[in-house]
Amino acid sequence: MGQHNLTVLTEFILMELTRRPELQIPLFGVFLVIYLITVVGNLTMIILTKLDSHLHTPMYFSIRHLAFVDLGNSTVICPKVLANFVVDRNTISYYACAAQLAFFLMFIISEFFILSAMAYDRYVAICNPLLYYVIMSQRLCHVLVGIQYLYSTFQALMFTIKIFTLTFCGSNVISHFYCDDVPLLPMLCSNAQEIELLSILFSVFNLISSFLIVLVSYMLILLAICQMHSAEGRKKAFSTCGSHLTVVVVFYGSLLFMYMQPNSTHFFDTDKMASVFYTLVIPMLNPLIYSLRNEEVKNAFYKLFEN
């Protein structure tokens, strides 16, 4: 029995999103549409904000990188989910699982701090409009994004290497529909308390630090809006922040719901719903919420097709 438990794994089995056969085809169609909208929407945002000189501003610089992260996050997860709807056995190879974990962590952690950088950008735009381009210089924008990518890559590689250099034993069934660190830890033969502690510490740090930046930025924005004498100015300020605030609430809410509940109350179905939201639904909604209703983006879109 012990020899069997220490057998080197070559593949994992992922849990299904649903075990009801009649829902397989409808869900495949839904997730295919979600993924196609995600790819088209985010690629459009990347191309428009790169090609149109009117969109070469700090705000659209952040939106371009958010679109890149959303596209990457969705592409890491969704194609495998779609494949699992049409195969009898939902397997993923050992190295593919490691790669999926690394890229997923890199993209999801990057999104935390891109959203917080966008909150700071909105704070500067509303509270210091005359100094906006001085404070949010091109150099600062590149430094902020560079630090985010370096930090997220470091953390993704650290957890992936730590987990996949240890031995897995027992069942090869991952209690999730993609490779994440939380469901992989109980499958390790050796004591995973160190990795589990690091996972909790980094998760809490990522959540709290990025959320505090968002919270403080919006508190200062709210104070500035309350001091505005013009109703038109207040309306414009609220419309500027409304889209970002909506996505922040949904994104952080789904993550908090999944990771901050006690282990004893974790249910696979509720975790699946939260995961679907921040890995598949939010990447689809972000380009729509942030930008496709924006007149500057619409003008850039029409200009691109006219040329």
Swiss-Prot record:
The chain crosses the membrane at residues 26-46, 55-75, 100-120, 140-160, 198-217, 238-258, 272-292. It is a multi-pass membrane protein. SUPFAM superfamilies: Family A G protein-coupled receptor-like. It comes from the Eukaryota. GO terms for cellular component: plasma membrane. Disulfide bonds join 97-189. Its main location: membrane. The keyword Transmembrane helix applies. Odorant receptor. Belongs to the G-protein coupled receptor 1 family. PANTHER family: OLFACTORY RECEPTOR. This is Olfactory receptor 8K5. It comes from Homo sapiens (Human).
